[in-house]
Amino acid sequence: MAATAISSLSFPALGQSDKISNFASSRPLASAIRICTKFSRLSLNSRSTSKSLIHCMSNVTADVPPVSETKSKFLKAYKRPIPSIYNTVLQELIVQQHLMRYKKTYRYDPVFALGFVTVYDQLMEGYPSDQDRDAIFKAYIEALNEDPKQYRIDAQKMEEWARSQTSASLVDFSSKEGDIEAVLKDIAGRAGSKEGFSYSRFFAVGLFRLLELASATDPTVLDKLCASLNINKKSVDRDLDVYRNLLSKLVQAKELLKEYVEREKKKQGERAQSQKANETISKCLGDTLYNPSFLVERKS
């Protein structure tokens, strides 16, 4: 699979509408949800013991909350309605991430964080309100008893590092010193031992984001990076294909939603103009009928 950059998707900003949250399912939307369900079924059976220099923030406690509690925490933290095109996918993601989060083998991974942030930002691009989008992210991560700021911080560190790399230096991390290099070395060691690494589809997206930011367009770079990290390249290829398909379906679904919103706005505008015209006519007729001078016979 060519390691070409995932094209940057630009979903047009959608206007607010009371009916957005009840938008009927379309074929592209239904397909996007099915793909997202497949995408979000993470690898839950592998072990992970993170020793990365970037903060490892989450260890599983003895008391594992049920999925319903995680979903309830999310809904309590963010009480505003979420358009169904976003909400359906978010609900599926949070269920699957809950299952991964509370496995005994789960450890926080900065590359995973980069992948999740990338997927979330692509999914929520074009959301009617930037402030709400950030609030939803905060509520989502905190519902999993993790730190949303740390997700963003680690993702930003990984992105900044990748922008300063070339295809060659990205692959040759093992011969260099630095915080991110230490993270990648740790991943390679754990993945190589097959005892302390938990691969996930978000991890695959995180890897690809590194390639994208390093402008690594040579198809062999991803092969080399996976080999350096002791990651199964076939799994990465498969998961990135699913990710691309998901984004494509989301574009189609959001375009349909945009058209729906524009039609509703147009209808509302037409109704408002019609009502205003009727009010103007009624006012004119009222002024004429109830004007006393109208009842006075004019003299020729």
UniProtKB/Swiss-Prot annotation:
One GO CC term on file: chloroplast
GO BP, one annotated term: sugar mediated signaling pathway
FT transit peptide: 1-67
Coiled-coil zones: 239-268
Keyword Lipid biosynthesis appears in the UniProt entry: no
Bilayer topology term: Single-pass membrane protein
InterPro entries: Thf1
UniProt entry keywords in alphabetical sequence: Chloroplast, Coiled coil, Membrane, Plastid, Plastid outer membrane, Transit peptide, Transmembrane, Transmembrane helix
Chloroplast intermembrane side: 68-196
Domain of life: Eukaryota
Cytoplasmic side: 220-300
Bilayer-spanning residue ranges: 197-219
Localization, UniProt: Plastid, Chloroplast outer membrane; Plastid, Chloroplast stroma
Tissues showing expression: Ubiquitous. Present at higher level in hypocotyls (at protein level). Ubiquitously expressed in all organs, in roots of both light-grown and dark-grown seedlings. Highly expressed in the root apical meristems.
Kinase listed as a keyword: no
Oligomeric form and interacting partners: Interacts with GPA1.
NCBIfam families for the chain: PS_II_psb29
Family label: Belongs to the THF1 family.
Described function: Involved in a dynamic process of vesicle-mediated thylakoid membrane biogenesis. Required for the normal organization of vesicles into mature thylakoid stacks and ultimately for leaf development. Also involved in a sugar-signaling mechanism in roots by mediating signaling between the plasma membrane and the plastid. Probably acts downstream of the plasma membrane-delimited heterotrimeric G-protein GPA1 in a D-glucose signaling pathway.
Protein name: Protein THYLAKOID FORMATION 1, chloroplastic
Gene giving rise to this polypeptide: THF1
